[in-house]
Amino acid sequence: MDIRDKILKLKKEKGAIILAHYYQIPEIQEIADYVGDSYYLSKIAKDCEENIIVFCGVKFMAESAKILSPEKTVILPVMEAGCVMADMATEEGLAKLKEEHPNAKVVCYINSSTEVKALSDVCCTSSNAENIINNLEEKEIIFLPDRNLGSYIQEKTPDKKFILWNGFCIVHEAIQKEEILRLKREHEGILTVAHPECSKEIRDISDFIGSTSEIINFVNNSSNKKFIIITEEGVLHQLRKNGEEKEFYIPYGKMVCRNMKMTTLKDLYESLLKMENKIEIDEDLRLKAYNSLKNMHKLGG
């Protein structure tokens, strides 16, 4: 019995569900029950009947699942799989901003720690951030940790005043305008598709901007045959499954989030077999963080 069959057998025996983000390696995406972006997976984790969730992603995703469903066992196969951007936001810094802007609503990207979520009014993802900001009555918004997503939403909601945290995704931030222009010159008629975690200069030369799920939907529904995909290359697995006749180009030929790529089938199998790497959150902290995630599902549409 190969490891894939072992995982499927074990999953059935334990009554577990496997969730995987689009940035996971293809083998993990293929064995998962659900593959999606952060918002979609958070909804699945909240609503699923299974009491054991194996979350193949990074730590903040598994923590969000536990915050929403404390009665469920949430396993993160590789505990070291963190998020550099999430670590850029601190409780102390946010508390100071809240003191300086007492009338502002705090909107935190889901790519943030449980501690930051606990100090926030509402959480958001790249796919629902605009809806959430529009649904807030307050005009002043503290947005963290991603300055790029924040500035993108600011452009979409000009009636709001944003105080942006100076955080960013190291994978998306590394992309330079010159590389995109080079690819455009080399491939006539190519469409440029970017994640809002990209810098403004990249967004400004893109044909479409959206979350991972929105990127996949856009490409799947497009009659165009060539695309520059400016996000973590894990999305290519889904794009190639749905568009075998289409050509995809990644800046520099490589956009990899090392944390997202840590989880292997062996890690998945062993964590489920041994029931290791369970997410544990202090109940007082969880309740505070729960409010921001509850509001996300309420206001996110």
From Swiss-Prot:
It catalyses: iminosuccinate + dihydroxyacetone phosphate = quinolinate + phosphate + 2 H2O + H(+). Its main location: cytoplasm. Its EC number is 2.5.1.72. It comes from the Bacteria. Coiled coil: none annotated. Transmembrane segments: none annotated. [4Fe-4S] cluster binds at C83, C169, C257. Iminosuccinate binds at H21, S38, Y109, I110, N111, S126, H195, P196, E197, T212. The keyword Lyase does not apply. SUPFAM superfamilies: NadA-like. Pathway: Cofactor biosynthesis; NAD(+) biosynthesis; quinolinate from iminoaspartate: step 1/1. Binds 1 [4Fe-4S] cluster per subunit. Belongs to the quinolinate synthase family. Type 2 subfamily. This is Quinolinate synthase. It comes from Clostridium perfringens (strain SM101 / Type A).
